């Protein structure tokens, strides 16, 4: 038994080290790739100063943090709702953040500062997450809870479409493209949003014990002495914060929160002590690679990154559904 535990621990360490190395390689690729390939040896040149340090570095950091946040949000929500198919986009949390953002643009008539827009996006994500948690407390079946989340997402999407369709504001039309997901407008002025993500990401990665208990089910967690009301609400706030900040920075990006935790679980990383940091690293890798594809797929334009993640993630999602039905 002790030998098996040691083998499992070594295997987990190898996984985390491998993912860390892949994050480093994906970061280097993101900094080099673009309309002009800039090798690391040219990063200190005048061209490198502009393209790498002023344009690509803030974008790469934002992609890395948002990918980690979305994957962690998916892992936390799957433990919270005891449902392996939940994720922020599928349950409408991302759309809730979008509604908060568009409401801020409408009510503020485009005059609100960036930090106020970010806070409104966070508030929208929190409201939808709290509504979902309210549904979960009514002991709905997993399928009904999923349907409730999908319905909330559709309602939020409809509200955004109505607002954009009837608006004459150029800002709201731009938001329609932005809600498809993209990092094209990220620069150092959004650094406060990146900083706002870091402490929550670190805190979530340290909460393996309550999440392991929650993953056992509400009854088992209560029998083990976990204060359910406190931890559920705290994790809901943290998840809403991560999703809201991510949407404020890059728009709605789907499937990262669903696919990444599933893939890692299929690889044997079921303990949240390993799953949480693994999700953060793997989410960062996936979104960095998707961002590189979005930048390089078209010669004279940039694909919305939400399109790339949906194209790659939807087939995986269907496969997971079929696998869970067996």
From Swiss-Prot:
This is Vitamin B12 import system permease protein BtuC. It is a multi-pass membrane protein. The keyword Transmembrane helix applies. The gene is btuC. Belongs to the binding-protein-dependent transport system permease family. FecCD subfamily. One of its GO terms (biological process) is cobalamin transport. NCBIfam families: PRK03784.1. Part of the ABC transporter complex BtuCDF involved in vitamin B12 import. Involved in the translocation of the substrate across the membrane. Keywords: Cell inner membrane, Cell membrane, Membrane, Transmembrane, Transmembrane helix, Transport. One of its GO terms (cellular component) is plasma membrane. The keyword Glycosyltransferase does not apply. It comes from the Bacteria. One of its GO terms (molecular function) is vitamin transmembrane transporter activity. InterPro entries: ABC_BtuC-like (IPR037294), ABC_transptr_BtuC (IPR023691), ABC_transptr_permease_BtuC (IPR000522). It comes from Salmonella choleraesuis (strain SC-B67). It is found in: Cell inner membrane. Coiled coil: none annotated. Pfam families: FecCD. The chain crosses the membrane at residues 15-35, 61-81, 88-108, 112-132, 146-166, 184-204, 240-260, 274-294, 302-322. The complex is composed of two ATP-binding proteins (BtuD), two transmembrane proteins (BtuC) and a solute-binding protein (BtuF).
